[in-house]
Structure formats: structure tokens, C-alpha cells
Regions:
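Alpha-helical transmembrane segments of multi-pass membrane proteins
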Residues: 1-419
């Protein structure tokens, strides 16, 4: 709850008031304050530090070694859950940046929702485990629900822009607060269900590891936590920098659903519990949902810009697109004029970047390069902030500058603009 509130308050209040650098400094001082309070409290309680010999090498019995072997599959499950958790957060944040907005406010909403879901899921898991529910059956069902939830969300992503556009003629949706509330609602509906399930899975798996590791519980749980963290790191790196850029968001999400499904299959094949008919029914639902998935997202819908303007802008059919963590979704649209002329428009996450229409936005693009030349005769160094379609950069290049630096939010813009 503290982490979730920190994400929300920082994004909407602290960062706008004091800036990013001061917010980071404030976070450091708060951490130091917490450490100081903990140190003072520990000394005030007169804790006696006793070196407890938890497990001597000579006391490691064959039974303990057998327990460690039995927990090996549990370790793999915990690692996969870590991979799915942070991998799913990475790709969901990417998708929500496309359909809900790519700003510090939007990211705060996403992170707040995800953390609240994890916290609620952990508490729900604690209450259920008190009732002595079979841990492996619980893990199996949670994995099924997670896989099903992930697949079902694939049907909703390209419908979200249309939902935002439906508010175009609503008179009361015209302020920042009202629009942020709607964005927050969308983030909640998309991210909260899988976050709750993941929040349930993690402590349940640790409980299962503890049950399996007779005599070596502390070592087993410590190893499980470490492997879960390794899975978190691999999930961010592999999904964010390999799967997403090269295979797209949809395939990334499907891969994570597969991994969750593998956990379920393992539980059914290698463990005995009475409720297998129920699990097979939900597996059937997953298969049906998967077989009805579209081949890809409808990029014409995703790139309408309704998340920015709460109104649809149709620049034609998407003929090229690139996805990445830094740029979200960059698209090139092609439309045909009545005189058989073809117009191409570049957008990033639905936001207009530029067009090749000479009587339209091409004029400002030319002006951004020509007007500064009226005020200087120097042709040494030039900095262009925002590449767009490359028109302004071309003007300055033709003006004869010796050195030019061009910066933009994403390499995808350079890639598509130069095609």
C-alpha cells in the first residue's frame, strides 16, 4: 500500500511541484529516515543477537537432500512466476502507454494499480492458506486464471481507443481531472485482475516450497525468493528488449500466457488432487479463447489518438509500424485524396508527428528550419530537437552546417521516417 500510494502521490503531486531530481533526493532522505527510525527502535528494545546455528553440514541427512530435490520443481515455478510478473508489467505498461497515454501521470496510474493488486492478492492468499487449502491445487487454479485473464485482455486492447473516443460529445469530460479519472479506470480494469492473481501466486508458491522442504525450510525459502528475483530481472530484459521489439506486443503477451499455462500443466501431471475436472474445464476455456484470438492487434484502431484527444483522428490505413519500450507504437498512415494523391502521416502512440502534405503541416516543418537561419550566419553546429518526418533536419543540412545532432524520443521515428 505504501509503494502504491508513493507511486500515485509522486506522479501527480511531488514531481510536478519539485521536479524529478528533487523527488529522487526526497526519496533518498525518506529511506535514510526509515533506516534511522529502525535503528533507534532496535536499540530501544535491547535486542540480544544470538548466532543461531541453523543447519550444520554434518547434520544434513539424506532426507534433507531428498527434500531439496523435491523442491527443485517448485523453484522453477517460482522463477517462472517472477518472469511472468515483471514481463507482464512491462508489456502492459507498453500497451497502456499506447492506448491510455505516455506520461508520468499515466505511468503512476499503472504502477499504482499493479501494486494495489499485488498487495490485495497477497492478503487474499494469506487468508485462504489459513483454511488449509491444498497449495498445489491453489497454484494450479491461479495459473489457469492468470493464463485465461491474459488471453482475454488480448480482445480488449484495440477496443480501448474507441471507448475514449465515445466521450467526444460528453460536455463534462473536458478537464484534466475528469480525463485522468477515465484513464485510471481503464488502467484499473486491465491491470488489476492479473496483478491480484500474481499477488496470490507468489506467497502460495513460497508456502508450497516450505511444505516440500522438510528440515531445510529457511534455505529453501531464501533460494525461492532469490530465484523469483532472477525471474523478475529476466522478464524485464527478455520481454522488454528482445520479444517486444522483434515479435510485437501480442506475441509477448501470448508467451506469458503460455508460461502460466505450463505451471498449470505441471501441477496436473505430477500432483494428485481431486478437483482435476474443474481444472480441465478451465483449460478448455483457455483453448477456446486462444483459437479465437485475432492474428494481430488492429493498429488502425490503436493509433487513432483518442487517448490523447478523446476524439478519433483518421489519417488512413496503417501501412507500417514499429513497437519498442522507449517509443511505444510508431505508425505510418496512408490516405488517398480525391485527386488520386497519396498522403502519408507519421504518428507516435496516436500523437501527430508530421505529414508529407505540402499545403498542410509541411509548411510549419519547413518554417522551423528556415526561420532560425534568418537570425544567424554561423554554420558550425546545429541541434534539432524532434526529428518528425525529417523535413526540418533536411533544411538545416542543406543550409551547410558542419555538425548536426538530432534527438527524438524513439529510434522508431528515425526508422519509419527514413523509409
Amino acid at each position: 500500500i505504501g509503494a502504491a500510494m508513493g507511486a500515485l502521490i509522486s506522479g501527480y503531486f511531488i514531481i510536478p511541484m519539485i521536479g524529478i531530481k528533487n523527488t529522487i533526493n526526497l526519496a533518498v532522505w525518506i529511506n535514510l529516515l526509515a533506516a534511522g527510525i529502525a535503528y533507534i527502535y532496535a536499540n530501544s528494545q535491547n535486542y540480544i543477537h544470538i548466532s543461531e546455528k541453523l543447519l550444520d553440514k554434518s547434520s544434513t541427512t539424506q532426507s534433507n537432500k531428498s527434500s531439496l530435490i523435491n523442491t527443485s520443481f517448485s523453484f522453477v515455478i517460482v522463477m517462472i512466476i517472477g518472469f511472468v510478473c515483471l514481463g507482464l508489467e512491462t508489456v502492459y505498461v507498453h500497451m497502456l502507454a499506447i492506448v491510455a497515454g505516455n506520461s508520468v501521470y499515466a505511468f503512476s496510474l499503472m504502477l499504482f494499480t499493479f501494486l494495489i493488486g499485488l498487495g490485495l492478492g497477497s492478503e487474499l492468499s494469506r487468508q485462504l492458506m489459513v483454511k488449509n487449502i491444498n497449495a498445489i491445487y491453489f497454484i494450479c487454479m491461479l495459473s489457469i486464471f492468470l493464463s485465461l485473464t491474459i488471453i482475454l485482455t488480448l480482445f480488449t486492447w484495440d477496443q480501448i481507443p474507441g471507448y475514449f473516443a465515445s466521450f467526444e460529445h460528453f460536455p463534462f469530460i473536458d478537464s484534466f481531472a475528469e480525463r485522468e479519472f477515465i484513464r485510471g479506470l481503464v488502467c484499473f480494469l486491465v491491470m488489476f485482475p492479473p496483478a491480484v492473481i500474481i499477488g496470490c501466486l507468489y506467497p502460495t508458491c513460497l508456502q508450497h516450497v516450505s511444505n516440500m522442504a522438510r528440515g531445510i525450510k529457511i534455505q529453501a525459502i531464501s533460494s525461492a525468493i532469490a530465484l523469483n528475483t532472477v525471474g523478475n530481472i529476466l522478464g524485464v530484459l527478455i520481454i522488454g528488449f528482445v520479444i517486444l521489439p522483434y515479435f510485437g506486443a501480442m506475441n509477448s503477451i501470448i508467451l506469458l500466457a503460455y508460461l502460466s499455462f505450463i505451471i498449470c500443466i505441471y501441477c496436473i501431471m505430477f500432483h494428485n488432487f481431486k478437483q482435476k475436472i474443474v481444472t480441465l474445464f478451465f483449460i478448455f476455456l483457455i483453448v477456446v479463447a486462444y483459437l479465437n484470438l485475432p492474428k494481430n492487434f488492429n493498429h488502425n484502431r490503436l493509433a487513432t489518438g483518442s487517448n490523447v484527444y478523446f476524439k478519433e483522428y483518421n489519417y488512413g490505413e496503417v501501412i507500417a509500424h514499429h513497437e519498442s519500450l522507449d517509443g511505444g507504437l510508431t505508425t505510418v498512415h496512408e490516405s488517398h485524396m480525391p485527386n488520386d494523391r497519396t498522403i502519408r502521416t507519421l504518428q507516435t502512440n496516436g500523437k501527430f508527428q508530421g505529414t508529407d502534405r505540402s499545403e498542410g503541416e509541411m509548411i510549419p516543418q519547413l518554417g522551423f528550419g528556415l526561420v532560425p537561419l534568418l537570425h544567424t550566419k554561423q554554420r558550425n553546429d546545429a541541434l534539432v530537437i524532434g526529428y518528425g518526418t525529417g523535413t526540418t533536419t533536411k533544411i538545416l543540412y542543406e543550409a551547410g552546417f558542419e555538425n548536426m545532432d538530432v534527438v527524438d524520443i524513439s529510434n522508431d521515428i528515425f526508422t519509419l521516417a527514413n523509409k
